[in-house]
Each structure stands twice: as structure tokens, then as C-alpha cells.
Amino acid sequence: MGEAMRILEKTMLLELSYPTSSTILPLLQDIKKSPKLFWLDTGLVNYFAGFQKELFGNEDISSFWKGKIAEHIIGQELLTLTDKVSAKRIYWIRDSRNSQAEVDFLYQFKGMLVAVEVKSGSNAKLKSLHKFMETANCNFAIRFWNQPFSTDIIQLSETKQYTLYNLPFYYACVLDQFLEKNV
């Protein structure tokens, strides 16, 4: 099965995204861990899910996906922000047997490592993001969601806090410009 997935990746139909447990640059993917599979064509994603007819004329495609398509769309937008054909999306996992934590994407911007979470609901928990930020050398993170722009100061401990920028999904295509102005 793994060989078939690698062939599909070489044909640029999908991407196998391997995790890292690092919170500093350079990021090294752990190819011994299970990868996330990202289809590179959203139309194929909808086709294989059997949602073509239902999507035409529908204003809210997330209702079919119950929010799960949001991570795919944001991942696609992050890929468009680079001109490197070989660019890979990387996600973070906590390297611990007793705890599972995952941050959806780690995005590199001007030598900084930016944690990016994608949440479709407004009351989503951010425990994994907080775990990442406890050890990361960064004082801000990004959450893409289906709500208006807002900013939160998250207090992790007496000595550690970070700014969480809550961006509407449609800000993904201008993430670099947002970071340029705000960090």
C-alpha cells in the first residue's frame, strides 16, 4: 500500500505529509511515523466522497463535510504561498507515549516557525496548540476558523504567553501579508 501511495505522490495526485516533533527550525520529517494524506485536487476529494451534485449551488460546502474539508482547503492555500514545486506541508505531533497532540500545519515565514491550527467551530479546544507553544520559541500562532478576525492572549504559565490570531478561512491566501504587518 505504501508503494502505491508513493507512486500517486510522484504523479502529483496526492501528498504524503509526515510529522515532526520538533519546535525549532530546521524541521525534519519523521518518515517512520504515519503520514497524513492530502489530495492535491479538491475536485477529486469531492468526487471520491460522492458529493458532486450536492455541492453545485450550495453556499456552505462545510455542511457536507462537517468541517473536515476546512483543513484540506487551508492546506491547499498554504501550498500556493510558495513557488517551490517540491514544497511539503508539515504537521507537528507530540513525541510522547502518554499523550497525543497534533498541530495541523507548521508554516515557515522569514526564518520563523508558525503554528497553524484549522478549526471549523468557534468553541474548539486548542490543547494541542498549547502543548506546542509551551516549548516553541515563538510568541504567536494562527487559527483559521469560520468566525470573524479576533486576537486572544493565551496565558500558558506565569512566564509564558502567546498571541493567537484567529483568522477567517478566506485570510489563508494572504497569510504572508498578514504576518508581514502583524509580527
Go through the PLM ranges and name each one.
Residues M1-E102, Y107:
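Accessory nucleic acid-recognition modules appended to NTPase machines
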Residues L44, R97, M112, G121, ...:
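Short, glycine-/Ser/Thr-/acidic-enriched flexible segments
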Residues S63, A115-K119:
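Short, glycine/charged-rich beta-strand-loop motifs at protein surfaces that mediate ligand recognition
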Residues I90, V114, I142-R143:
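A structural signal for isolated positions on well-ordered beta-strands in alpha/beta enzyme cores
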Residues Y107-A115:
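Active-site beta-strand-loop-beta-strand hairpin of nuclease catalytic cores
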Residues S120-T163:
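Catalytic cores of nucleic-acid endonucleases
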Residues F149-V183:
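Domain-level recognition of nuclease-like catalytic cores that cleave nucleotide substrates
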